[in-house]
């Protein structure tokens, strides 16, 4: 089945739909790794990707953003010189009411009768000033990390900003 455009699910409407025990079956989220890189090292610079508007981020968009940052930082710095954590978990279940189209569809379908929909995916609900990603690195790779987070923000359905939470004086001296 074709994946619907993310704009169909990006607005927050109604209460969260998370009780999986009442559903027939929910597809697993595509994002499975939430923490990457060197978790033991204490890095001097920490940056966060912060949402500016309320939205729902599909599990595929979270995975695309994670892969984007991971690939860029692995090529630039290597796995030992950065840390990445994806904060929101896609708990909210997205539903879709499948509609038959084409010749003779009116005889087969029941229209809007019993139009509750079947689970098709999951999403994370994010509100303004919620942290989406936390990333840490050293001085040598700080500019690359900021660029990687900015490119990851493009893959998400909400405008985001990169906030430096640790090492502002170091980042200021580097011109970030």
Swiss-Prot record:
Pfam families (alphabetical): Ribosomal_L16
Entry GO terms, CC: ribonucleoprotein complex; ribosome
GO molecular function: structural constituent of ribosome
SUPFAM superfamilies on file: Ribosomal protein L16p/L10e (SSF54686)
Keyword Nucleus: no
Sorted UniProt keywords: Ribonucleoprotein, Ribosomal protein
Biological-process GO terms, alphabetical: translation
Family: Belongs to the universal ribosomal protein uL16 family.
Protein name (database record): Large ribosomal subunit protein uL16
Organism: Thermoplasma acidophilum (strain ATCC 25905 / DSM 1728 / JCM 9062 / NBRC 15155 / AMRC-C165)
């Amino acid at each position: 089945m074709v994946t619907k455009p993310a704009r169909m699910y990006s607005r927050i409407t109604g209460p969260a739909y998370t009780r999986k025990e009442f559903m027939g079956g929910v597809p697993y989220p595509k994002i499975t790794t939430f923490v990457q890189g060197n978790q033991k090292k204490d890095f001097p610079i920490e940056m966060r990707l912060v949402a500016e508007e309320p939205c729902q981020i599909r599990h595929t968009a979270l995975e695309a953003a994670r892969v984007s940052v991971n690939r860029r930082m692995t090529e630039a710095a290597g796995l030992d010189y950065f840390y990445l954590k994806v904060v929101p978990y896609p708990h909210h279940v997205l539903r879709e009411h499948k509609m038959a189209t084409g010749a003779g569809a009116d005889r087969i379908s029941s229209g809007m009768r019993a139009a509750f929909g079947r689970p098709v995916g999951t999403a994370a609900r994010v509100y303004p000033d919620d942290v989406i990603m936390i990333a840490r690195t050293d001085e040598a790779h700080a500019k690359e990390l900021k660029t990687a987070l900015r490119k990851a923000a493009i893959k998400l359905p909400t405008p985001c900003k990169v906030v430096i939470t640790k090492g502002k004086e170091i980042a200021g001296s580097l011109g970030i």
